[in-house]
Amino acid sequence: MSQTTEKRSRFLHVGGWVAELVLVFVGVYAAFWLNNYQQHQQDAERRDRILASIEKTLREGIESGKINRAEQEREAAEFQRTLDAGEMPPLRPFVFTTDYSPGDFATLLQSGGIQLLDLETRTALRNDESVIRWGLSRMARYQKLSDELIVPNLDQDISFFYDPATKKLRKRFEIYPEALQARVKFANDLERTHTELLKRIQAERQRNH
């Protein structure tokens, strides 16, 4: 075999090896790209499911919250009006019920789901959860005081709760109108943070569609 033929053979061999290497590289890159694309699609679908679920919860909560808040505002305003008029309105058990829980959204966001959301949405979500936690804690405190101070004494004469001379609530029962006002404030705060979070979620969903 001549030197020229040998060089040509060696060149073809090296060329074939390079071509195979390029094909392997292209194949690996294509597989990597496809995997990333599929992962991105899965993340996008998961993010939208999370956002859609939270959006539904918020919409329902805001609507029912408006109805409850209106009733609570009337109750608080009427009690304060009659109290200011010296009519010594009767005290009732303080009750607070809600469908909300700090863990409502946590379940949706477990296993890293929260990392799929925009920073602004995460901030609004944490703010909403903070309002829920703080409000529920305060409502639980008032309900506990009501169960201890008011409920066991509902069969008592009105003078048990009021000073007949001043027609003012006795000191230990002054928490009652405070609790009614706090319940209204919690409802207002909750509607505000729910609305802010809802707007953020709607904006993120629209941007990603």
Where are these regions (language model features)?
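Long, hydrophobic alpha-helical segments that serve as membrane-spanning/inserting helices
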Residues: 1-15, 29, 36-209
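Hydrophobic membrane-insertion alpha-helices, especially the h-region
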Residues: 18-32
